[in-house]
From Swiss-Prot:
Protein name as catalogued: DNA-directed RNA polymerase subunit beta'
Organism: Marinomonas sp. (strain MWYL1)
Job of this protein: DNA-dependent RNA polymerase catalyzes the transcription of DNA into RNA using the four ribonucleoside triphosphates as substrates.
A single GO molecular function term of this UniProt record: DNA-directed RNA polymerase activity
UniProt xrefs under SMART domains: RPOLA_N
Binding site for Mg(2+): 460, 462, 464
Record's catalysed reaction(s): RNA(n) + a ribonucleoside 5'-triphosphate = RNA(n+1) + diphosphate
GO cellular component term, pick one: DNA-directed RNA polymerase complex
Annotated binding of Zn(2+) 1, by residue: 70, 72, 85, 88
């Protein structure tokens, strides 16, 4: 009996382990796993269905088929456990040992493992320093390889073909040893002396200068060192013994009709065994060499197919022409072991059904069909029935439940009380896709869902299904109630705004309820309190929309949380007074004394949550919903054809447009405009016409005439149903109303270009056949796009989750004083996102000082709504806040650097899985983004030629990064490329900001006051000027007529201009001449740039135009030459989802902007073919830096100009890698954040910056080692940032030199595959490559991330699981401490161990 208990115990106990190591298995190890050798290819006997002895399913090797019964049936029952039957040799045991016992095959000839051979880079090739092609020639018996040259002229590792081999035999006899096949490779690997190789390679690394050689050596050195340190032996990459998978993992199942379904692996094993046995027999018979060789090659091929079918040559196919599934295929891909079975498991106690609306439910409830509940809660019901004594056994209880006796329903009611269930809707794009509710039993078969949680689930009731899961243990129930209950998820984790917001009917009802109507029944009445209003409305003495006076008693909450009661008489309407009745105490009447549109309702709930807390907000949200539904019903809004009013002016507007189009057609026919101009003009015209028609329609719809009390006719907002729905934000938009009542407008062709002829009809009038046909393009493209978008968006989310999954908050404060500086986001002069909004919920890194030098906020403050008002009042423009990117915590992030937990509204807790939350927040709106690349056509490209800055608001001028030259007229001319002009208000807050191009003329100075609408700067948008910085006389050089320049005179004005010829037009003599202008003083001496020794001179690029001649005098700030800007063609702008993916994958754009590699003075060196050589000489005397730039790039700087590191020299899209290299981590984070936000903002999606920073942080995990100093890192190697910091700390502690490094930016896919954890990487993508690399280097997985822990079946080290992991660590350390100092352990030691464990 004791035995039996031992067995049960061993099942329950989980082996405690801290890391998983992957490595190569030695032949001895494989034999030690094995329970016997598989000698025959047979599987089972087709008559008796018993496994053949020594075959692939042999019971003697793998264990019995039936529990505790040997094969011949001599020993049965438990009492013979562990006996080995003498007749059939089978051990009596559980049949499930057939899932874990392995066998082996002794190979007659060694075989190379295909993963280490073919998985690039080939590990065998790298370690032997041979090419893959050569190794394959040896392995597949095409050439001999010299293993031991002896006393001959041959080299070790030299390849010989048959002829050369026989020649060598004749010449040297048996002095040397050359072989072919895997055994030759095995012998070479065995002869490798790793320590010697490592030393010689390290020496050569230090002595060589060749880049390629260094690269090659460091690769090989890394591999050999990995082998040496991991204890793997290179010769194990060639197999002598092949393990055989346990038979129950490759089953053979009988089908009806006497046929068998079998796993492909059995076929593959059978092939190997057949060939192996045939080879053994051939070797015994000492068959001719050529036959043996052929057999060996076939054996190699069959083992290759077993391990990874299709990696080499054609895949072996089964009877039905389908490639067989090999061992590698079993673990990789979506259907492989990792993603199908380890990361995604099906769970018990779950059901699914269609969902319907539950408008009468409370927020924390859901309606659960009785049938489902009975099934889901069965075990609870059984135990209750037994406990009550209503049923004697479980079997009896089961019968009762099946009969559905009345007492069963009573017990079900009891069981279900306060037992939450979880509802999930696929696709679960973010954590709000699974929430917990308390079930209410209902009749019927559909689950009832509370309408307010639909937004979080993205659910509607057109047939969506949802799954129900039951948390069984008390811990699970507790977590479901405390963390996952729908009432705890009012705010969205993506942006901290409420997500439980009324929509559709509810919005319409609340909107209708709070509208005003002129001259409604009861207008002008006064009421003493809201109760009286209720009575009057109930008695039909007043209408809902009547304007009345009501005495209101409100309780407001101050910023410090004090309640302030007050009473006053308000001008309001009946509906608003009734609505205020459900508003909780603590909110002022002003929040509802307005027409409640969707945005207002959202703000109301947000305000409610911040002021009166979670519980009140939930109750209030419910009340809002009930009220909204009630009044939506009362309003009787519906849509009829007559509600779409076609504006009477429409016909005239369209006729006018058509006349203008005719006019443009005539101009085109006369050759006055080009095809392109005509197209743009027409499209512009129709866009404007569409706008005009829409405006006319809205004007018509939005207002209606009515008679007021005095009998005058006045206009008021219309009560047209369609208008109310669109205006309130309940459903529909102006764009949709335009199509129904205005005109459909322009349509796009499938390739994205716009068709010139618009659809002038609308849906109410009906479309003609031609118009209908035109509009099918768009509809079809919409459908195709949606399908693509969903897949792409899902894949982006998957990559994001994978890269960020192991980021968890692990400590409260890392003590970092660094941070990133944040300013308001400004686009085209408008503040899009104010500073306060961006820093809300973040921690201040350095004290905030306003413009006057006054102290505003202390470092370490978590900024809340109150602080935001303080910041805005103080007029702070920029502040430094803590960020995940600058956090010093080694594994994980600290709470201070992250800031507020957006879904809860307070500082984030330790254990919050911020990485996954960030990934979900960015990925979830992915489906709302567009897929297309935009073509700029018509309106857009013309609007882009801005030629002046006109300020929108009054204020004070400020300059930023400004370099300017003063003109003799007193105006300033901008002389730098990154200048900005900002306008600040009285408090010193920045209101608008504009970029100024080089050569812009300013009419204001720093500190000037401007008025709204004033033009402060202007420039010529079509040319790029070269401005003289000093005054003097011009001196030309290299300007020879018809060699480098042409003179052109204008007949009209008689002025001549000089044009610099293009390279391709110049004669040979002019190819190397560089046209230049120098400025000299009256005596003819060159004028110097102030403070330097270099003369003022300007290189003239090709196509430059000059209007001044040699010897002319110039003043400072005068334009010397103009370079015409080629209008940049209609380049496609990548937008939407592909743009976000490009940013996160850190792809280098085509023709990226060229940035200055260092700060200094620019000069141009000798040109090479097709490229300009740009040299930057630093002022401090460092080495000059050269950059080669293609000639066709427009270069923005001139000879002798000073640039700052990272300044843009040639325009183009920025490359994130360049930003990181030249401007640092902060600039990069800023760039990616802004670019990603721009895409989402276009779609109206709000995401908090910190989520994007979390992903950027994960992309920056690796560094490249520059000089390795005294650490054991290899130069040019990519290592984890934390690993490098550890190594440097160690070196510094010993007083040695630390390593130098550069941060590296990896795209999210690369970063996921480069994580420390091989389990996480293997379950993401490229499983074979990851596992091969891991095995060779003997990688250890410390199970720090979430994914690895899910795979090994543990709680994740996040959330409530973090406590479990910390406790495990603590116990282990205490046990260790007890072991080491078992005699004396002081309390302080334990304390230390504890605190260390917690820190860890």
């Amino acid at each position: 009996m004791k035995d039996l208990l031992g067995l049960l115990k061993s099942q329950g106990q989980s082996d405690e382990f801290d890391a998983i190591r992957i490595g190569l298995a030695s032949p001895d190890m494989i034999r030690s796993w094995s329970y016997g050798e598989v000698k025959k290819p047979e599987t089972i006997n087709y008559r008796t269905f018993k496994p053949e002895r020594d075959g692939l399913f042999c019971a003697k090797i793998f264990g019995p088929i039936k529990d505790y019964e040997c094969l011949c049936g001599k020993y049965k029952r438990l009492k013979h456990r562990g006996v080995i039957c003498e007749k059939c040799g089978v051990e009596v045991a559980l049949s499930k040992v057939r899932r874990e016992r392995m066998g082996h095959i002794e190979l007659a000839s060694p075989v190379a493992h295909i993963w280490f051979l073919k998985s690039l880079p080939s590990r065998i090739g790298l370690i032997l320093d041979m090419t893959l092609r050569d190794i394959e020639r040896v392995l597949y018996f095409e050439s001999f390889i010299v293993i031991d040259p002896g006393m001959t002229t041959l080299d070790k590792g030299q390849l010989l073909n048959d002829e050369q081999y026989f020649e060598a035999l004749e010449e040297f006899g048996d002095e040397f040893d050359a072989r072919m096949g895997a055994e030759a490779v095995q012998m070479l690997l065995r002869d490798l002396d790793m320590p010697v190789e490592i030393n010689s390679m390290r020496e050569e690394l230090n002595s060589t200068n060749s880049e390629t050689r260094i690269k090659k050596l460091s690769k090989r050195l890394k591999l050999v060192e990995a082998f040496y340190h991991s204890g793997n032996n290179p010769e194990w990459m060639v197999l002598d013994v092949l393990p055989v998978l346990p038979p129950d993992l490759r089953p053979l199942v009988p089908l009806e009709g006497g046929r068998f379904a079998t796993s492909d692996l059995n076929d593959l094993y059978r092939r190997v065994i057949n060939r192996n046995n045939r080879l053994k027999r051939l070797l015994e018979l000492s068959a001719p060499d050529i036959i043996v060789r052929n057999e060996k090659r076939m054996l190699q091929e069959s083992v290759d197919a077993l391990l990874d079918n299709g990696r080499r040559g054609r895949a072996i196919t089964g009877s039905n022409k389908r490639p067989l599934k090999s061992l590698a295929d079993m673990i990789k891909g979506k259907q492989g072991r990792f993603r199908q079975n380890l990361l995604g498991k099906r769970v018990d106690y779950s059901g699914r059904s269609v969902i319907t609306v539950g408008p009468s439910l409370r927020l924390h409830q859901c309606g659960l069909p009785k049938k489902m509940a009975l099934e889901l809660f069965k075990p609870f019901i059984f135990s209750k029935l037994e406990l009550r004594g209503m049923a004697t056994t479980i079997k009896a209880a089961k019968k009762m439940v099946e009969r559905e006796t009345p007492e069963v329903w009573d017990i079900l009611d009891e069981v279900i009380r306060e037992h939450p269930v979880m509802l999930n809707r696929a696709p679960t794009l973010h954590r709000l896709g699974i929430q917990a509710f308390e079930p209410m039993l209902i009749e019927g078969k559909a689950i009832q869902l509370h309408p307010l949680v639909c937004a979080a689930y993205n659910a509607d009731f057109d047939g969506d299904q949802m799954a129900v899961h039951v948390p069984l243990t008390i811990e699970a129930q507790l977590e479901a109630r405390a963390l996952m209950m729908s009432t705890n998820n009012i705010l969205s984790p993506a942006n901290g705004e409420p997500i439980i917001v009324p929509s559709q009917d509810v919005v319409l009802g609340l909107y209708y309820m709070t509208r005003e109507k002129i001259n409604a029944k009861g207008e002008g009445m006064a009421f003493s309190d809201i109760k009286e209003v209720h009575r009057a409305y109930g008695a039909k003495q007043v209408e809902l929309h009547a304007k009345v006076k009501v005495r209101i008693s409100q309780v407001d909450t101050t910023l410090d949380g004090d309640k302030v009661p007050s009473t006053f008489i308000a001008d309001t309407t009946v509906g608003r007074a009734l609505l205020f009745d459900i508003v909780p105490d603590g909110l002022p009447f002003s929040v509802v004394n307005q027409t409640m549109k969707k945005k207002a309702i959202s703000n109301l709930i947000n305000e409610c949550y911040r002021k009166v807390g979670l519980k009140e907000s939930c109750i209030f949200a419910d009340q809002l919903m009930y009220t909204g539904f009630a009044y939506a019903t009362a309003s009787g809004s519906s849509v009829g054809v007559d509600d779409f009013v076609i504006p009477p002016e429409k016909a005239a507007i369209i006729a006018k447009a058509e006349a203008e189009v005719k006019e443009i057609e005539y101009q085109y026919a006369d050759g006055l405009v080009t095809q392109g101009e005509k197209y743009n003009k027409v499209i512009d015209l129709w866009s404007r016409t569409n706008e005009t028609v829409t405006e006319a329609m809205m004007k018509n719809l939005a207002k209606e005439m009515t008679v007021n009390k005095a009998g005058e006719t006045v206009e008021q907002q219309s009560f047209n149903s369609v208008y109310m729905m669109a205006d309130s934000g309940a459903r529909g938009s102006v764009a949709q109303m335009r199509q129904l009542g205005g005109m459909r407008g322009l349509m796009a062709k499938p390739d994205g270009s716009i068709i010139e002829t618009p659809i002038t009809a609308n849906f109410r009038e009906g479309l003609s056949v031609l118009q209908y046909f035109t509009s099918t393009h768009g509809a079809r493209k919409g459908l195709a796009d949606t399908a693509l978008k969903t897949a792409n968006s899902g894949y982006l989310t998957r990559r994001l989750v994978d890269v960020a999954q192991d980021l968890v908050i692990t400590e409260v404060d890392c003590g970092s004083t660094n941070g990133i500086s944040v300013a308001a986001m400004i686009e085209g002069g408008d503040v899009v996102v104010p500073l306060g909004h961006r820093v809300l919920g973040r921690v201040v890194a350095q004290d905030v000082i306003d413009g006057k030098g006054d102290f505003v906020l202390a470092a370490g403050t978590l900024i809340d709504e109150h602080d935001v008002r303080t910041i805005e009042a103080a007029g702070v423009d920029e502040m430094i806040i803590r960020s995940v990117i600058t956090c010093n915590t080694r594994h994980g992030v600290c709470a201070k650097c992250y800031g507020r937990d957006l879904a809860r509204g307070h500082q984030v807790n330790i254990g919050e899985a911020i990485g996954v939350v960030a990934a979900q927040s960015i990925g979830e709106p992915g489906t709302q983004l567009t897929m297309r690349t935009f073509h700029i056509g018509g309106a857009a490209s013309r609007a882009s030629a801005i030629d002046s800055v006109q300020v929108k608001s009054a204020g004070t001028v400020r300059f930023n990064k400004m370099k300017s030259i003063e003109r003799h007229t007193g105006h300033l001319v901008v002389a730098s490329r990154s200048s900005e002009l900002a306008i600040a208000d009285e408090a010193g807050r920045e209101k608008e900001r504009y970029k100024l191009p080089y050569g812009a003329v300013l009419s204001v100075r720093e500190g000037d006051q401007v008025t709204a609408g004033q033009i402060v700067a202007n420039w010529d948008p079509h040319t790029h000027p070269i401005v003289s910085e000093m005054e003097g006389r011009l001196e030309f050089s290299g300007m020879e007529e018809n060699v480098t320049i042409r003179r052109q005179s204008d007949e009209m004005t008689g002025l001549t201009t000089i044009e610099v010829m293009e390279m391709r037009d110049r004669p040979a003599a002019g190819k190397d001449i560089r046209p230049m202008i120098a400025v000299v003083d009256a005596e003819g001496n060159p004028v110097l740039i102030p403070g330097t020794e270099s003369p003022v001179q300007y290189m003239l690029p090709e196509k430059a135009l000059l209007s001044l001649d040699h010897g002319a005098t110039v003043k400072s700030g005068e334009v010397l030459a103009r370079i015409p800007q080629e209008s940049i063609g209609n380049k496609d702008i990548t937008g939407g989802l592909p743009r976000v993916a490009d940013l996160f994958e850190a792809r280098r754009p085509k023709d990226p902007a060229v940035m200055a590699e260092t700060s200094g003075v620019v000069s141009f060196g000798k040109e090479t073919k097709g490229k300009i050589r740009l040299v930057i000489t630093p002022q401090n005397g460092d080495e000059p830096v050269e950059t080669l730039i293609p000639k066709w790039r427009q270069i923005n700087i001139f000879d002798g100009e000073e640039v700052a590191k990272g300044e843009i020299i040639a325009d183009g899209p920025l490359s994130p890698h360049d930003i990181l290299r030249l401007q640092g981590v902060e600039a990069l984070a800023d760039y990616i954040t802004n670019e990603v936000q721009e895409v989402y903002r276009l779609q109206g999606v709000v995401i908090n910056d910190k989520h994007i920073e979390v992903i950027v942080n994960q992309m920056l995990r690796k560094v490249e080692v520059g000089e390795s100093g005294d650490t054991d890192l290899i130069q040019g190697d990519q290592v984890e940032y934390t690993h490098l910091l550890d190594a440097n700390e160690k070196a510094e502690a010993e007083g040695k030199f630390p390593a130098k490094f550069e941060r590296v930016l990896l795209g999210i896919t690369k970063a996921s595959l480069a994580t420390e954890s091989f389990i996480s990487a293997a379950s993401f993508q490229e499983t074979t490559r990851v596992l091969t690399e891991g095995a060779v280097t003997g990688k250890k997985d410390h199970l720090r991330g979430l994914k690895e822990n899910v795979v090994v079946g543990r709680l994740i080290p996040a959330g409530t699981g973090l406590a479990y992991h910390n406790e495990r660590k603590r116990k282990k350390e205490l046990a260790l401490a007890a072991k080491e100092g078992s005699s004396t352990v002081s309390a302080s030691d334990v304390e230390e161990a504890l605190s260390a464990a917690l820190k860890d």
